[in-house]
Amino acid sequence: ESIDEIDPITGDVISEQPIQHITIYPAKHYIADMSTRDQAFAEIKSDLAAQLTKLRLEGKVLEAYRLEQRVNYDIDMIQEIGFVNGIENYSRYFDGRKAGDKPYTLIDHFIENAKTFGDGSFLTVIDESHITVPQIRGMYNGDQARKKTLVDYGFRLPSALDNRPLKFEEFSRLMDTM
């Protein structure tokens, strides 16, 4: 058996030489240690219990049932295989953030790299700013509207609202030079 380099167009083997080194990346780039996972599961279960109580008091029995089934399935999948579709809706628990905290973004990486490899600043260029800047605000508002519906109807825990784009004010505070 071997791993060969293949021409993507013809399907022919490109080289008869054995590959000496190869990097294979995971399909999903999220890893959490066991203590982080255990803490996350405890918080998820606590928030689930609170949300189930709220839904039942509002007479939303179907929504409560739906949410309980969904979250318990998600927890089981994460425990068994380390992943579930929609795991991003639990990102706050695994990141150790509180409800409403700003999510981590690529901009955080830019800031950290600017501090590590430079003077701590970086330039942000926004082309077509008359279109792009309003879209930054719109991304947050649209995301919240969609996810609020999922929460209200028992498809997701309220923590799903914390897996979101930045608010415009958060984005503006992160920009060093724009």
Locate the predicted segments by residue.
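Extended, highly charged clamp/arch subdomains and adjacent linkers
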Residues: E1-T177
